[in-house]
Amino acid sequence: MYFIGLDIGTTGCKAAVFDETGACFGRCYEEFDIICRAPGWAEQSPAVMWDAVTHVLKESVAQAKAAGMRAEEVRALSTSVLGEEVMPVDGDYRPLRDAILGMDYRADEETKLLTGAVPAQRIYDITGFPPHPMGSLPTILWMRRHEPELIPRTYKYVTFTEYVMKRLGAREGVVDHPQAGRTMAFDIERKCWSDELLRAAGLDRSLFCETAEPGRVVGNLSQEAAAELGLTEAVALVAGGQDQTCAALGAGLIDESIGMDSHGTIEGIGVMSSKKITDERALAAGVSCYAYTIPGRYFLMSSSQVGGLLLKWFKNNFSLAEEQEARRTGRNVYDVMTERAPEGPSGVMVLPHFIGSGPPWNDLDSRGAIVGLTIDSTRHDVVKAIMDSLTYEFKINMLYYEDMGFRFKDIRVVGGASKSPRWMQLKADILNRPVSTLREKDAACLGAAMIAMCSMGAYPSCEQAVRACVKVDRVYRPDPAWTGAYEAAYRKYTHLYDSLKEFNHIKIPGGTV
């Protein structure tokens, strides 16, 4: 039996074909660009995304066939999809505009209108979503206020989950509970859309799709999709999860002693929880709480607004020499950049708030900064400062989770950074905790595929699927030679935001400095 995990992210999508042991027989990735039509805006073309989806599915299936798989052996496909994105579609599921992404903050005023109608703590108690412009609900209100001509043509507001599943052959658009939990409109205890919040927003429940537990079969591949992908119509389409929850399952988070460092375009900490946590302290810290890929469990997450995106920004603007060397030698440009970074704490520090700050400050007006530069500083020092500072941000949130009672025996890293031994050792030294990487680097694809496995009866539970399929590749342990120096640097870093806050909030023509 074979199972397909499809992972749609912020800047690209990938697909992977696994057997029931978690062995991968084909994979493909395709990148796409974020559309930025104005400062602070971020959109994605559903047409570009769909073309990428069909390409990665076809290519991964072709690779698996070349390795001996037969089309009729593929049992099911499930999805892992970025959260918060939303777009209106008509009755034929044709998009009426590009999707607005979660990193788009244009709906700040609409968020304030919602919290004026329903107190922030009440919204958080219902949805587990700290009120924020990234939520789908305030974004929908922005569309209705600024693009009213679309209202009469709108059949549903959907994420990429419903859109892709419908185009693949699902009977109707269905959104899984973890993904619905990223809309700021879903009641995470009752597992349905919140009538209270929809009334406050002036929206009818009929504008939203049906919701489903991860693992529910929502249809089968259509004849057209099966022919295009080289599969059969017998392939079941299985409700999956939001990308962070699928990555967490693929990283083996089946108890509360394992934390996840999801380090891709953005970086965040995630942990499985046996109980809902939406108290005042968690709200103040910006902790998201929503449905996990294991029914009856919750997923807690705190995300920075950047991660690998910040290193990409530096590469695009300052690393021409490293790009040329990477092309000449056939190496990854980020490996070239990070290997030249000096050892030990950088004398330079970066405040990585280039798109505002995430938890625990949750300050949209905070801005990025590079401090501590001298005439002797080089771009390699700044690269190291980016690596250090992103890890300091993660540590602040990790320690908050430990204050809540979580005791991490292991931090498992997923995403692009997990492929860098240099960065993994740095994380272990700064966090002063064991840090692990996984045999299967595409954890979100594996997580989605394991949901499909359980749905088809390959395993009686996700926990058993994890024990069979998830394997730790390498454990990085803190180096005592560096932990003390990094702890001292971390303590200095914790003062950086407050030191720059007043300056960052000065309004000048053209925006916020």
State where each predicted segment sits.
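Residue-level signal for inorganic ion chemistry
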Residues: 22, 45, 77, 104, ...
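Pocket-flanking alpha-helical
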Residues: 87, 109-113, 247-249
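Short beta-strand-loop/turn "lid" adjacent to the catalytic site in phosphate-handling enzymes
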Residues: 64-102, 130-134, 165-187, 210-213, ...
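N-terminal glycine/serine-rich phosphate-binding loop of ATP-dependent small-molecule kinases
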Residues: 1-98, 125, 226-227, 231-236, ...
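Glycine/GP-enriched mid-protein hinge/lid loop-to-helix segment characteristic of carbohydrate kinases
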Residues: 22, 95-117, 121-123, 379
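Alpha-helix termination/capping residues and helix-transition junctions
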Residues: 68-71, 80, 205, 253, ...
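A generic structural motif
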Residues: 30-31, 102, 305
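Active-site core segments that coordinate phosphate-bearing ligands/cofactors
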Residues: 3-5, 17, 115-128, 132, ...
